[in-house]
Curated annotation (Swiss-Prot):
NCBIfam families, A to Z: hemE
Pfam families: URO-D (PF01208)
The protein's annotated pathway: Porphyrin-containing compound metabolism; protoporphyrin-IX biosynthesis; coproporphyrinogen-III from 5-aminolevulinate: step 4/4
Function: Catalyzes the decarboxylation of four acetate groups of uroporphyrinogen-III to yield coproporphyrinogen-III.
Record-stated family: Belongs to the uroporphyrinogen decarboxylase family.
InterPro entries reported for this sequence: UROD/MetE-like_sf, Uroporphyrinogen_deCO2ase_HemE, Uroporphyrinogen_deCOase
Record-annotated membrane-spanning stretches: none
Residues holding substrate: R25, Q26, A27, G28, R29, D74, Y151, S206, H325
Protein name: Uroporphyrinogen decarboxylase
Keyword match Ribosomal protein: no
Enzyme Commission (EC) number: 4.1.1.37
Amino acid sequence: MLKNDLFLRALKRQPVPRTPIWVMRQAGRYLPEYRAIREKTDFLTLCKTPELATEVTIQPVDIIGVDAAIIFSDILVVNEAMGMNVEIIESKGIRLSPPIRSQVDIDRLIIPDINEKLGYVMDALRMTKKELDGRVPLIGFSGAAWTLFTYAVEGGGSKNYAFAKKMMYREPKMAHMLLSKISRVITEYLLMQIEAGADAVQIFDSWASALSEDDYREFALPYIKESVQAVKTKYPDTPVIVFSKDCNTILSDIADTGCDAMGLGWNMDISKARAELKDRVTIQGNMDPTVLYGTHDKIRAEAGKILERFGQHSECSGHVFNLGHGILPDVDPENLKCLVDFVKEESTKYH
């Protein structure tokens, strides 16, 4: 039994006494307690050690007071489970090898047994669930097919996604074959996370804004919808959040996937998003992460604007306060604590 279920109730657009808050990348480098653990181990080992992943997952709940925990992991564990070599190199970035650029490469990728290849994530979820003891809900997550596709084809991060788009435009059938294969794994991965104890799941499409509206509808949304529908079919009471970064012009299309909530980037007025969506889904967001570099007064002022612009809640509205992207690693934890405390206090007047 959850002692604090505000996050889940907000995702289901049920009445809540205040706006719940958590932030993307809340378990991370801005926390000295996290850095102390990272000094002793590398990033992927941390992801793959359930005891350590559990500890860092719970840190922001204990230290900051957020209303939900999100399991500590990385979106690229899916690529690794499918047979790619994933390296996260300090100060150099991410490298995946070999890059997937031909039919032979696609055929070489496996559809893994999730429990075998990603069992450490399930162990971390179960362990975290036990340690949380119902204090707050636990979120599972995956990258979206398009974002994982770009990493696979580019062999890492990219500025212009040239190899990924070359496959899209020259070999669209091949691109869809790879996207479909990745999507199958994502869907099974999300289902297994729920089975292991996740109370909600989020799909991160971090590179969504690299695509035009038409291309996003063709190469990204169908696979998000596939995963959302699979989750809602098997676990109808488990909320699904879709975060398609900076896709502000196709909000209705994203809502049409059947998701319960939608992450909103900071470059759109939340009042406009709510007006367009007409409370069909919960809106999650949407403060600029760099606001947390500001003074406490500035942080409160900017958070207050978002609460005010979302406005008074109706019987079927939902808002989860979050950043428009992940918290930056050099933010002062006290600034995030200021934000969380302010939202908890100030949001009551809108409910």
